[in-house]
């Protein structure tokens, strides 16, 4: 079969498999690839190709991840699968693979296990918006009541972490049997694909969001005023738009009087573009790196938040020793470092390199943030951890 060319016209959705070790995440990933390419065309990936996950580095952290792609009639999916539990933790916290939705794989022979719970908690903390459940290995369970019991348990567990446990789709299937080509089980994979299509809404494209540009540099151009430069994170800024400067100092309002890219004047700057924005009446010393330029009212500055953090291991170039409460590192948001203090959960005295932990961070000056924002933890310019804002406190 000829290689299909990448269809730009279909909506692109990012998904991934999560769940306990050996519950069948990689087998399911292979089964989805196999059944969908058989049904709708494309190129299938087998278990060995997916299992042999290449090493990637995201912010200095080594993560093994497999990426596969598949199509349904209406969408193009990019799917991420990780071989080890630690890879999941790192992947979700660094946002190396941002998921629009996750497929939680639970072996019906085991029911929910410790990592099932941990992956659900992580999904909640890092802002995975939708979860679909695939109960795997159902060919090995003859007792219909047992399957119902496992399904109930999984739904309750999801509800415990504020996912709509009673309403989300649960598909009972067998990834291995589907991979072996048994029609009744292949049908379950198609049912899963339909659930992905209907239950996970089309993600908002970066360009459709509220405008935000993290400021990297500030220049003053004689006779014209102050220019800030950076890469537009989302949205569009047009000449004449009112914008806010948020973070570090008091929030101020100004107007965009010009946009330029590669020394050419433009009418607008769009998500993904590096550009300079000319600000009316703003003095050079009123803006600095680390602030953001944003659509008024779309983002606010905060100093205190709950976060989920992964602490780099010694092998990854992280700390060699644990840290304790009272630890004061730098927190690197977008373009700048801000000092902050940490509060550990009750009963936790110290944090070891290689751990993941929930902590409350208090910064010495406010940063423009919303839930889901990623950051690095640094000591003297060296990254020692990665985190995500789970909940804003103040």
From Swiss-Prot:
The EC designation for this entry is 3.6.5.3
- Region (G4) spans which residues? 136-139
Q: InterPro entries this protein is in? A: EF-Tu_GTP-bd, EF-Tu_GTPase, EFTu-like_2, EFTU_2, G_TR_CS, P-loop_NTPase, Small_GTP-bd, T_Tr_GTP-bd_dom
Could you cite one Gene Ontology molecular function of this protein?
Answer: translation elongation factor activity
Query: PROSITE patterns in the record, alphabetically?
Result: G_TR_1, G_TR_2
The protein depicted here goes by the name: Elongation factor Tu 2
Region G2, annotated ranges: 60-64
Q: Quick one: where is this thing mainly located?
A: cytoplasm
Q: Any idea where this protein resides?
A: Cytoplasm
Q: Which residue ranges does the record annotate as region G1? A: 19-26
Corresponding gene? tuf2
Q: Where is this region: G5?
A: 174-176
Keywords from the UniProt entry: Cytoplasm, Elongation factor, GTP-binding, Hydrolase, Magnesium, Metal-binding, Nucleotide-binding, Protein biosynthesis
Q: Where does GTP bind?
A: 19-26, 81-85, 136-139
Q: Which organism is it from?
A: Shewanella loihica (strain ATCC BAA-1088 / PV-4)
What is known about its subunit structure?
Answer: Monomer.
Q: Where does Mg(2+) bind?
A: 26
Q: One GO cellular component from the entry?
A: cytosol
Upper lineage? Bacteria, Pseudomonadati, Pseudomonadota, Gammaproteobacteria, Alteromonadales
């Amino acid at each position: 079969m000829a290689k299909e060319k990448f269809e730009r016209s279909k909506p692109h959705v990012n998904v991934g498999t999560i769940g306990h070790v050996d519950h069948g995440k990689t087998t399911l990933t292979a089964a989805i690839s196999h059944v969908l390419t058989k049904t709708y065309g494309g190129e299938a990936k087998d278990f060995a190709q997916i299992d042999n996950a290449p090493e990637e580095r995201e912010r200095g952290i080594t993560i093994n991840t497999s990426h596969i792609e598949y199509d349904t009639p209406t969408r193009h999916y990019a799917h991420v699968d990780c071989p080890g539990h630690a890879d999941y933790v790192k992947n979700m916290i660094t946002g190396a693979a941002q998921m629009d939705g996750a497929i939680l794989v639970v072996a019906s022979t085991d029911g929910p296990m410790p990592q099932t719970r941990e992956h659900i908690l992580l999904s909640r903390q890092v802002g995975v918006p939708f979860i679909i459940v695939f109960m795997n290995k159902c060919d090995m369970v003859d007792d219909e009541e047992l399957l119902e019991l496992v399904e109930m348990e999984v739904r309750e567990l999801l509800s415990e972490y504020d996912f709509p446990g009673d309403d989300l789709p649960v598909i009972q299937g067998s990834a291995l049997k589907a991979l072996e080509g048994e029609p009744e089980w292949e049908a379950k994979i198609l049912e899963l694909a339909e659930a992905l299509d209907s239950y996970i809404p089309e993600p908002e494209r970066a360009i459709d969001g509220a405008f935000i540009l993290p400021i990297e540099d500030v220049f003053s151009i004689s006779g014209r005023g102050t220019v800030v430069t950076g890469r537009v994170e989302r949205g569009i800024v047009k000449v004449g738009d009112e914008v806010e400067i948020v973070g570090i100092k008091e929030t101020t309002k100004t107007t965009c009087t010009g946009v330029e890219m590669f020394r050419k004047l433009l009418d607008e700057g769009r998500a993904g573009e590096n550009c300079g924005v000319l600000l009316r009446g703003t003095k050079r010393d009123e803006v600095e790196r680390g602030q953001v330029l944003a659509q008024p009212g779309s983002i606010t500055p905060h100093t205190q938040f709950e976060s989920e953090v992964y602490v780099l291991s010694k092998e990854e170039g992280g700390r060699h020793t644990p840290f304790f409460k009272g630890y004061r590192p730098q927190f690197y948001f977008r373009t700048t470092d801000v000092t902050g203090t940490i509060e550990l959960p009750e009963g936790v005295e110290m944090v070891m390199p290689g751990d993941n932990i929930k902590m409350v961070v208090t910064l010495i000056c406010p940063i423009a943030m919303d839930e889901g924002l990623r950051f690095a933890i640094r000591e003297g310019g060296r990254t020692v951890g990665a985190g995500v804002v789970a909940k804003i406190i103040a």
